[in-house]
Amino acid sequence: AVAVNSPFFPPDLYDADPETVLSDCWMENRVPVFESVLNPDGDPKVTFPEDIDSIDEALQRIADDETVVPTLLERGDRFDDRFEHFRHKHGSFWRWVRPVFDGPTRESANARIEFRPLPCQPTVRDTIALQAVFAGLLESLPRREHPIYNQPWADARENFYAAVRDGLDAELRWITADGTETTDTEELYAELFELARDGLELRGLDAEEANRYIQPLRERVDRRVTPASWKHERVAEAVGRGEPFAQAVWGMQAEYIDKQTETLIEGTFVDWL
């Protein structure tokens, strides 16, 4: 929700009037576009994944997934070439969160989880902030045995699509550390950032370092603004002044690039505000 960054397509792709586009657009269009283009009839391949309870189940999910590009592969010299056809299927196992098993040598063989919906960010520091928050959460949540692990799958799925659709305006369901269910976004984000800070400290950062990494995203929440909402507001204001929709979108994009150029390395997105 704090990272959304793609509310518009190129303006010549729209048939609807500007008011409809502005009211109906998703804040992160990459997710619905990928799903609509690549999902075949029947079981979807690009989707929020079902729960997985074991490594065996994760392996079986990939093995059972519909094959899109059948290929005969020659075995190479890598360790994971022993299961080259299974590894090849990773390339079309399109879940927004997915397991990956590989490794060029036995010593480097690994199982990892890819969290794939994170969009690109306007600056380097914003990108690092997003990675830091996720790294901190992945460290803190299991160590603290946080009750969000008990959230029903249906709620997690709805949270995902609500965040993609509405950004910071999404109504999200959260379970606090004391087990209380809430939709209070102020409480949700406050606890989320504290858990991220805790996780970074558990990995060896001091409190000042951890807070510095997290701060760009914390400020977005405090100011109720994301890159997507910034883009949406710019286009809406231009259309409100009477500009043609296409001119409004291209003008917004030009301003985005100018500000990104000014802040790419040393600044953050909130410096634009």
Sequence positions of predicted segments:
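Loop-rich catalytic cores of soluble enzymes, especially ATP-dependent carboxylate-amine ligases
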Residues: 1-111
